[in-house]
């Protein structure tokens, strides 16, 4: 269907521009963007995510470094590694793959990353800049940044007169998404799983962002005809039709039921996910440019 937003294709276009801008940095200023990824333990899902990020970084022409720490590593050792990377001029972006083991304080780890190298956009200073509408100076969390690019592709950069509803209030997606949409002049409602009359609120949305972590929660009767639906959810559910014990990935939106009612909708997989990794590359490229006080490439 023509109304399905192809996240893979859009991400490929973003990556092509990142490659081009990386070549310019190398040729004009002899600088290669560098990213360091830290993974603690051997969680299979985390291993897959880290491998895809590292592969994409190398594809972009970045210097890429991966640090694998044992699950039982002391928090102090992790913080010491972050401090070393903070001081390394070859590294412009640092990310700690989440989740971390229970004995490590996630906030202490993410806040230890230098603000200018916080390419996940999780540092309180970057969050504060975004909330204060100082977007040009902030590093924007990757998933909201990617979702926003998809929305702009459909609606343009000025969302005046449009109602946007976000279902999900996380610091990683919901809250930064609300700030970005507000900055683009949308009228924003930030809802969550405990919001009263949630289906009715969703039906008012010209732009509906689902980021609540509940598989196929958003049904057809929740969606306004002609809405743009961005599904950030990624959930694994049983797929007995594939065989015993098999699973499949679905979003927070009941895609098959909802898609015919929308102006545009993102699938899961192949929607927001590829854009998240693409925006991580964008953030790293921008961090490298800022490190030399060069103009920041626009995307």
Curated annotation (Swiss-Prot):
The keyword Amino-acid biosynthesis applies. One of its GO terms (molecular function) is methenyltetrahydrofolate cyclohydrolase activity. SUPFAM superfamilies: Aminoacid dehydrogenase-like, N-terminal domain (SSF53223), NAD(P)-binding Rossmann-fold domains (SSF51735). InterPro entries: Aminoacid_DH-like_N_sf, NAD(P)-bd_dom_sf, THF_DH/CycHdrlase, THF_DH/CycHdrlase_cat_dom, THF_DH/CycHdrlase_CS, THF_DH/CycHdrlase_NAD-bd_dom. It comes from Bartonella bacilliformis (strain ATCC 35685 / KC583 / Herrer 020/F12,63). This is Bifunctional protein FolD. Its EC number is 1.5.1.5, 3.5.4.9. Pathway: One-carbon metabolism; tetrahydrofolate interconversion.
């Amino acid at each position: 269907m023509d109304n399905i937003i192809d996240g893979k294709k859009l991400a490929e276009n973003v990556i092509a521009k990142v490659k081009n801008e990386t070549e310019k940095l190398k040729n004009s200023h002899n600088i290669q963007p560098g990213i360091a990824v830290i993974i603690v333990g051997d969680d299979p899902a985390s291993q897959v995510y880290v491998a895809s990020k590292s592969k994409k970084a190398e594809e972009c022409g970045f210097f890429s470094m991966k640090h694998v720490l044992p699950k039982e590593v002391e928090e102090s050792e992790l913080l010491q590694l972050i401090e070393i990377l903070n001081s390394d001029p070859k590294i412009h972006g640092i990310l700690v793959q989440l989740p971390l083991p229970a004995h490590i304080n996630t906030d202490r780890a993410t806040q230890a990353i230098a603000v200018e190298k916080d390419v996940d956009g999780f540092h309180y200073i970057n969050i504060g800049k975004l909330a204060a509408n100082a977007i040009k100076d902030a590093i924007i969390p990757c998933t909201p940044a990617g979702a926003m690019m998809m929305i702009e592709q459909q609606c343009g950069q000025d969302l005046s007169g449009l109602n946007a509803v976000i279902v999900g209030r996380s610091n990683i997606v919901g809250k930064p998404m609300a700030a970005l949409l507000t900055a683009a002049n949308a009228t924003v409602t930030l809802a969550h799983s405990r919001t009263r009359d949630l289906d009715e609120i969703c039906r008012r949305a010209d732009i509906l962002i689902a980021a609540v972590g509940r598989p196929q929660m958003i049904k057809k009767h929740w969606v306004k005809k002609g809405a743009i639906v961005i599904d950030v959810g990624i959930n694994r559910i049983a797929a007995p039709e594939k065989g015993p014990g098999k699973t499949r990935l679905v979003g927070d939106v009941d895609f098959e039921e909802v898609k015919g009612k929308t102006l545009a909708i993102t699938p899961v997989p192949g929607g927001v996910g590829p854009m998240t990794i693409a925006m991580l590359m964008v953030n790293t490229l921008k961090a490298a440019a800022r490190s030399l006080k060069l103009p920041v490439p626009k995307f």
